[in-house]
A protein has these predicted regions:
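Ordered hydrophobic segments in well-structured contexts
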Residues: 26, 139-141, 209, 233-236
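Single conserved hydrophobic/aromatic residue that forms the stacking wall/gate
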Residues: 1-8, 12, 232-243
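GHKL-type ATPase core
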Residues: 5, 9, 13-116
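A generic structural micro-feature
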Residues: 2, 45-47, 200-202
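Ser/Thr-centric signal marking residues that sit
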Residues: 49-51, 163, 223, 238
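Short, conserved micro-motifs enriched in small and acidic residues
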Residues: 5, 167-171, 230
Length: 243
C-alpha cells in the first residue's frame, strides 16, 4: 500500500499506518518529502491487518481543499462494483448520519440492475461478458431500457479508474456492439432493403458498464478521464460472439 510521489506532493502532510505481522508501522510525509522513517509504534493481534492513510490536500494544487463528497461516494461505489465481494464503507466525520456501505457480489450485473431498476427492459437478463488475454481483460454488462428512460447508466473504467471521456475501450465496445447487431440482422433478413443500422440505433436507451484492466494503459491528461491506447483487438471481437 502506498501513494505515489506525485500524490504526496499534492498534500501538505500525510501519514501512513500499516498493521502487519502483529505490529503497527507508521511513516510520515510533508509537502511530498519523507518526514520520518518507517517505525514500529505498537502491536496488534496477528489477524488484525490493514492500512490507514490520512492526508490533507494542498490548496495550491486544487481550487478547494474540501473533498467533494458526492464525487468521492461515486468513486468508492465504483471500486466496490469493479471488485466483486469487496466491501467499502464510507463515514462522513462532519455528519455522523452520513454513512454508506457498498458491496456487489455479482459485480457489474448487480450494479447495472440497481442503477436502472423500476424500468422496463428489453432483455429479461442483461448481457454479461468477461474476456481476457495475457495482458488485458475486459468485462461489460448491457441492457436496453424500453419506453421513458428515468436513469440511463453509461460508465466505463480502466484499472478501476473512471474514464468519463471514454476512449479506445469504449469505442471498441460500441464498434463491436454495432457490428454484432448488423451481422445478426443481415443474416436473418430482419432489415428492409437499403436500410442500415447506425451506432445511434443500437446505443439509444442502452444502459451499460465497461471495466477494462490493462497492463500498460495510456491515458490522455493527468485526470485519466480518457484512454488513448488502442484496444480494438480485445474490446471489439470479444463482444461479438456473446452479443
Amino acid at each position: 500500500h502506498y501513494c505515489s510521489r506525485r500524490q504526496r506532493q499534492m498534500c501538505i502532510r500525510d501519514r501512513s499506518t500499516i498493521k502487519r505481522d502483529g505490529k503497527i508501522h507508521e511513516m510520515k510525509f510533508e509537502n511530498g518529502e519523507k518526514k520520518s522513517e518507517l517505525e514500529v509504534i505498537g502491536e496488534v493481534g496477528s489477524r488484525n491487518t490493514g492500512t490507514i492513510i490520512k492526508f490533507k490536500p494542498d490548496p495550491s494544487y486544487f481550487e478547494s481543499e474540501k473533498v467533494e463528497v458526492k464525487k468521492l461516494k461515486h468513486l468508492l461505489k465504483a471500486k466496490a462494483v469493479l471488485c466483486p465481494n469487496l466491501k467499502i464503507s464510507f463515514t462522513n466525520e462532519n455528519n455522523k448520519k452520513d454513512k454508506e456501505v457498498w458491496e456487489y457480489p455479482s459485480g457489474l450485473e448487480s450494479y447495472l440492475a440497481e442503477e436502472i431498476k423500476d424500468q422496463e427492459f428489453l432483455l429479461k437478463d442483461p448481457i454479461i461478458s468477461s474476456n481476457a488475454n495475457d495482458d488485458n481483460s475486459i468485462d461489460f454488462a448491457i441492457n436496453w431500457i424500453m419506453g421513458n428512460v428515468k436513469n440511463l447508466l453509461n460508465e466505463s473504467y480502466v484499472n478501476l479508474i473512471p474514464t468519463a471521456q471514454g476512449g479506445s475501450h469504449l469505442n471498441g465496445f460500441k464498434a463491436g456492439l454495432l457490428e454484432s447487431l448488423k451481422e445478426f440482422c443481415e443474416f436473418r433478413n430482419l432489415l428492409p432493403k437499403g436500410l442500415k443500422l447506425s451506432a445511434d440505433d443500437v446505443l439509444q436507451n442502452a444502459a451499460f458498464i465497461i471495466s477494462s484492466k490493462l497492463k500498460d494503459p495510456q491515458f490522455a491528461g493527468q485526470t485519466k478521464e480518457r484512454l488513448d491506447l488502442s484496444l480494438i483487438h480485445i474490446s471489439e471481437p470479444t463482444r461479438r460472439p456473446k452479443i
